């Protein structure tokens, strides 16, 4: 009887490499970060588990809800879908980087004043998306606000208080310019 030899599948080498740590360099909230990460680790997990910045939330983990939004080079991205190595040499902003010290920024303050926060789980993603929108377009229409928040789901507020907070934030930011 012929002895069977073990043959590894072509994908097994890739699976072995998944356990290796890769060097990672990027800027997070204005500070340089250097670390070693698994190539399969998401940016969400890296930020929350390794850096202990828990403001960014993981809800659906499928890129459908927007609670995990971060800005990568100024563009909102679902950090649950971005692998940590993909932000090599890029700038990442989380909700922790939005506020100025211990004071909320204008958008955060307007969310508070307008009652646009209920359970709060979606709030970091909404505020992060709004930061990107208002940086690109300081005077958005209601339709542009809705389009800018298209990837964010809020199950509590019904969006009216969120839209009012964003309009007031845009107005307040316009007065400061």
Where are these predicted regions, by residue range?
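Signature of N-terminal electron-transfer/Fe-S-associated modules in redox systems
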Residues: 1-177
């Amino acid at each position: 009887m012929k002895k069977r030899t073990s043959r590894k599948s072509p994908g097994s080498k890739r699976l072995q490499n998944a356990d290796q740590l890769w060097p990672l360099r990027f800027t997070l909230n204005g500070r340089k970060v250097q670390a070693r990460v698994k190539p399969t680790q998401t940016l969400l997990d890296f930020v929350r588990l390794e850096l202990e910045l828990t403001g960014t939330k993981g809800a659906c983990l499928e890129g459908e809800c927007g609670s995990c939004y971060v800005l990568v080079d100024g563009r909102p991205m679902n950090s649950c879908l971005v692998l940590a190595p993909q932000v090599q040499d890029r700038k990442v902003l989380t909700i922790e980087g939005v506020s100025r010290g211990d004071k909320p920024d204008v958008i955060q303050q307007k969310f508070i004043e307008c009652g646009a926060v209920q359970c709060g789980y979606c709030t970091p993603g909404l505020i992060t998306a709004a930061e990107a929108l208002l940086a690109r377009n300081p005077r958005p229409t209601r339709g542009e606000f809705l389009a800018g928040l298209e990837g964010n789901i809020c199950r509590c507020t019904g969006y009216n208080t969120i839209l009012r907070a964003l309009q007031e934030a845009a107005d307040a930011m316009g007065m400061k310019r």
